[in-house]
Every structure is written in C-alpha cells, then in structure tokens.
Amino acid sequence: MVFPSQEEQIEKFEKDHVAQHYFEVLRTLISKKSVFAQQVGLKEVARYLGEIFKRVGAEVEIDESYTAPFVMAHFKSSRPNAKTIIFYNHYDTVPADGDQVWTEDPFTLSVRDGIMYGRGVDDDKGHITARLSALRKYMQDHDDLPVNISFIMEGAEESASMDLDKYLEKHADKLRGADLLVWEQGTKNALEQLEISGGNKGIVTFDAKVKSADVDIHSSYGGVIESAPWYLLQALTSLRAADGRILVEGLYDDVQEPNERELALVETYAQRNPGEISQIYGLELPLLQEERAAFLKRFFFEPALNIEGIQSGYQGQGVKTILPAEASAKLEVRLVPGLEPHDVLDKIRKQLDKNGFDKVELYYTLGEMSYRSDMSAPAILNVIELAKKFYPQGVSVLPTTAGTGPMHTVFDALEVPMVAFGLGNANSRDHGGDENVRIADYYTHIELVEELIRSYE
C-alpha cells in the first residue's frame, strides 16, 4: 500500500475547499478564548458552534442552564434503522498562562513549516472542525448520510466535566443505543503510529492541611516543638512506599485486574519504556519501576498517589528562622477500574488516623471514575481496520491511557462502545506553550473520519 507523504497531504488540504472553510472556522474558534477555570467566553463559543452546525443542516440544541453551556448537534439519516455515531468533544481549553512559552499569540492560529499553533488546536477545538469537515466532505458527493451522527460538545472538560452526568441523564433517551462513540481526541505516538485507545484512568484530587500553632514560632524551639511542615511531610511519607506503591489498607482490594487481552495489547503496542521516558523528560531521579513489564502494568493498570504541590513557611530572599504554623499540599490519586473517588479518600483518611496523623485535614476537590472499553467490540475493530489504510507506520491499540477524562460518566449514561483516536502528535504540547498539530495529521484525521462514515453504507 502506497501512502501519501506529509507534503502531499498538505497539498491536498490546501486544495480542499471544505477543509479550508472549516480551517477558517478553527481560526475563529482559537481567537475566542473559552476557559472554564476563568469563566471566560463559554457562552460566546457555545453559541458560535451552534450557528456553525445550524448552517449545515444540523438540529442544534444549546443548553445554557449549566455553568458551561452544552451544544448538541444531530445529523439524521433517512435510512430506516440507521445506526448512530456520537462524537464527544469540548470547546473549553486550559489557560495560556504567562509562564508558558509561546512563539506567537496563543489565541491567534498561526502556521509555520506545515504545523498549526494555537491554544486548543489539538485539545480540543481542532478535533471539532476536523470531524465536521469529514461529515461535510462526505455530503459533497451524497444526498444522505448512511448513519445518524450526533455531536456532544461541552465547556467544562478541563475542570472535570462537572455537569456532564446530569446533562447526559437528561438526554440519554435520544443518545442510547448508538453503535459507537468517538472520544474527544487522540494522538500519534513517538513511532508515528496512530494510538487507538478505549479508556482512561480516573482521579480524586484533594488538599491536605496542617495547623500546628496559632503563630509561627522561633526556630530555636525546633528540638521540642513539632512544626506543621514536618508533621505533614511525615504524614504523606507514611502513605507511599519508596517504590511508589500506595500504603493504604484495602486500596488494592477493589482494583480490577487487566485481562489477558488487555495485558497483551499493552505489551505489543505501548511505546513507553523506561529508557525512553528517562530520556524524553531528562529524569534526574531513578524510575519507580525499571523492568518493562512492571513499568507498563504500573503505568496503565495501577493507581498512583501524587503530590501536585507543597506550601509552607518562608520562601523569600535570605533566611527567616521560624517553625511555620501551617502547611498544605495538593494531592491526587490516579484511579483504575474498581476504585471510587470518595471511597479512596475515605480510606486515606482512615490510614492517616491509624498512622497517628489525625491532625491532617483533608478536603476533597474533584473526582472522576476510570473506564476501559472492550477493544474487541465490532465497531471498535472496524475503526482499527480502517485506520490501517491511512497511517504508514500502523496503529497502536491500547485498552486504556494513563490520563483522565469523563469516559466512565459517558458510558454509565449511554452504555455505548467508546474509542479514542485523533490528530495530535507525540509533541503536540497540550496544556503547554506552542500547542500544535501538523497540517498533514489534521487532514489525515479528516480522511479517516470520512472513511468511518462511508463504512456504514
């Protein structure tokens, strides 16, 4: 099979008037800042998307009764008993903070050397326009769709999709029974293989706080008075072994072990090994798991307790000889199937009490359950086979990713097979400076989604 080069894909993209039209829509979307964490631009972007979909004949519903509006767009086939594909996407992005390095304005879509840059170009606005481009390209040559297509677009994905469960419960009757749900995004790995995955880890995040005194105390008392930071550090250390295993009683009892197929998929396709990880990130500390099989099992199928940040005492210039009265930390546990956020936090609370650290106060912030698809579902196998036609380096099929998203929420409401694949690359820098997508990959995603629609003829 002969595959087009990146240059040929760019040339096709530049000559494709449908792709060019929605590239301009993407340019507008990038320019419209929509950050849930800052409550900026959410209604404006939701309404703009609603108009874009209405113009091409979709039945559009915009629900502004939530903190971030939901946009649903339906394209109906006239065929009796037509199946349904759902595309789940989000229009919110993370901020483009001042500490991120951007070569150009993050809210101006720019193109350099065949690569497009901008906040949300991969996560996730570019996926919306690429998938709509695919649908419109199919409709150029056909009077009807062979399959019903629905888009669900939310504006709070980057903040744990806080209302998604309630929204889907309200609309479940019109969405249940779909043949397939295509997840918000995906990427190619470092070997240029398209990663096709069917799940993600969950998460529970929480704050830990300690107050040891009414005021900071002179550090000359350090030999006889316990300080908040020492107390907190000892408490946190008691929760994790040196090899990274979580030391919380009962936590692993409910973990759903991977089956043989899931282990085999990871062993065959996962392009993450200890040596590469160390090199990519310039690690100065040893890995918690050096042996590849144990590394992969830990990465994909086991929970992880992480410290996101610690704060206490004086951090200014020079010295300040004190015993800080307060200390706090932001923590998270990455969850796997079988673990529920509130239950995990309850177990941590009990373990801290048992370990003698009852003065540590815990505050739940957010949580999401984890999910793994059945990667042998016929609709998912169809995607895998179709993708092989478009990616010269092949595909990498993974039962789950180590990241987090609301897959469990969607499955719980709709009970539909879900698969993730997209237009990103191994260096797309989502959430960082110079977020980017190669134009060739963007256009290949359009072609694959169009072929997916055609496969239902």
Task: Name each model feature, range by range.
Residues 2-99, 326, 343:
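N-terminal helical capping/dimerization or prosegment-like subdomains
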Residues 195-211, 421:
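Flexible glycine/proline-rich, aromatic-decorated loop/lid segments
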Residues 82-153, 444:
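Active-site metal-coordination/substrate-binding segment of hydrolases
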Residues 124-199:
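Acidic/histidine-rich catalytic neighborhood of metal-dependent amide-processing enzymes
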Residues 92, 239, 243, 349-358:
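A common structural junction motif
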Residues 166, 222-243:
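A short core secondary-structure module
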Residues 91-93, 115, 152-160, 184-189, ...:
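Acidic, glycine-rich active-site loops and adjacent beta-strand->loop/helix elements
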Residues 80, 191, 247-326, 334-347, ...:
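An extended, acidic, His-containing surface patch that forms the Zn2+-binding/catalytic region
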